């Protein structure tokens, strides 16, 4: 059985865009690693208050855990969605950007826990 040439061209284009998508996902994983590393400095955000009445150091660890779990969940879910869609023949170049937006929301949530 012969596959029409139009399908072969569209399949090559899809594969090319998916390769680019997975490379962008690798950059997203690097950004996620940077976000986890950045969360290690959350304790410095509570140093501005020298009075024991406004001590907020008990917020640091929950904010760090929020960041760690959130980054892990975003990276895992983004990868699962990308693999599932690429196995169906869909282009997945947009999903790392959705993951980047989700990482931003994770940071906002961790910052809300911290302050």
UniProtKB/Swiss-Prot annotation:
Topological relation to the membrane, as annotated:
Multi-pass membrane protein
Recorded GO CC terms: plasma membrane
**UniProtKB keywords:** Cell membrane, Membrane, Transmembrane, Transmembrane helix
State its location(s).
Answer: Cell membrane
TM stretches of this protein? 23-43, 63-83, 90-110
Please state what the protein is called: Uncharacterized protein Mb0986
């Amino acid at each position: 059985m012969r596959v029409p040439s139009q399908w072969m061209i569209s399949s090559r284009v899809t594969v090319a865009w998916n390769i680019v998508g997975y490379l962008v996902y690798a950059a997203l994983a690097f950004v996620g690693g940077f976000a986890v590393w950045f969360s290690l400095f959350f304790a410095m955000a509570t140093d501005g208050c020298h009075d024991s009445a406004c001590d907020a150091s008990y917020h640091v660890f929950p904010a760090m855990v929020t960041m760690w779990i959130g980054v892990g969940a975003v990276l895992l879910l983004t990868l699962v969605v990308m693999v599932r869609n690429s196995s169906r023949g869909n282009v997945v170049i947009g999903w790392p950007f959705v993951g980047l937006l989700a990482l931003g929301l994770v940071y906002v949530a961790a910052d809300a826990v911290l302050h």
